[in-house]
């Protein structure tokens, strides 16, 4: 049997070309058409056959160029891997003990020490430990070769040199002896065997072709997560360094540390129908009437106009004020230029106040004016806590009228109380649809006079005064106001009442 020499390999290279490039999906493994003439091994490329031939001849053409290093290797890849050990920088780090390594395979071998299921092999002669059976047997072969024994400890076969013995030990890598783990799990599609079922499932992507791991930098897909990690470290190392060195952006103050307890209280209530909300008592709640649009459904003649609790979006819902701030009393102010209440809350509740005020300004600006030649004076109504007897309830609020000075005689055509009657519950006549655009309602003199006289008795608290904060009774209006009403004109705007 002839020995393979470099000259023979050049002839083989010319006659048969090895397949180049990566294997496409669905293609079978390339056939090993290059057998070794000294052993029964075969290879799929001339380069691999050449590297293997060095194990028979003992030649190591790739020598280390570092000073005071005499090591040589059979392939250029192994030389490059060895050169990393001379570099002062260790790029491979253990995530468990922070230990650094020059080579990735050294780190991989070190990780076995952190695996409780892995068994270590300790040499009895020198005390050195190994994590793999192959490494341990190679170490024993070195001790045996030093003493002159070149016998394999597995099959008891004798070899002529230490290098040949070490090459032979690779054939025993999958065999078990003395409690060493065995590859019991075989792939259903090929002959490969694995230690665990997890390794088999990870290997199955080779046959299924699934690539579920996407690179976020180049959109390349991989079948295994470790392959994606290896690709990102190799091809996108600069991008990863930028991500690690970039400072953490400070979040917007409006999105940081913002707790919204009202939202949690409203979620179970918003899912209820409006009829259930009106009939269901809620403890420790505040009833407000915030109108968002003039096109609200009105009841038929003879029915009572109820004051319902609405939000700016038209949803009927009680607001739990204890959740917002339980230790402060609220003061309500209602300017005549608006149809809704604005909430005056302490500093911690300013965001809620700003939202309601901005909504009211939009509503006021969008409403058309019925009389443009008249002017409105600034008058305010306040909701202040009553200081009466304890029977009235500690949390009740009453609607008190501030001091009003009437400088001019009241002119009936210039008066408009439609805004007032839009948010005060009255037992009045049916709603006039022709006055929807101007937010107004028409009443005769008798009806308006009787309605105004009934104001202190019609307004009632919607909830239990012991647990809720309701709207108090209205003070009686001025006699000059009630005596000047006319039956032939539509009631003017409310904010123009007191000129």
Curated annotation (Swiss-Prot):
Cellular compartment(s): Nucleus
Record field: compositional bias (Low complexity): 369-379
Spans annotated as Disordered: 1-33, 364-400
GO biological process per UniProt: gland morphogenesis; multicellular organism growth; negative regulation of gene expression; organ growth; positive regulation of gene expression; positive regulation of glial cell proliferation; positive regulation of transcription by RNA polymerase II; prostate gland growth
Recorded GO MF terms: DNA-binding transcription activator activity, RNA polymerase II-specific; DNA-binding transcription factor activity, RNA polymerase II-specific; RNA polymerase II cis-regulatory region sequence-specific DNA binding; zinc ion binding
Region annotation Decreased nuclear import with localization in the nucleus but also in the cytoplasm: where it falls in the sequence: 41-242
Protein's recorded name: Zinc finger protein PLAG1
Stretch list, region Activates transcription: 243-499
Lineage: Eukaryota, Metazoa, Chordata, Craniata, Vertebrata
One Pfam family it belongs to: zf-C2H2
Region Interaction with KPNA2, residue ranges: 2-84
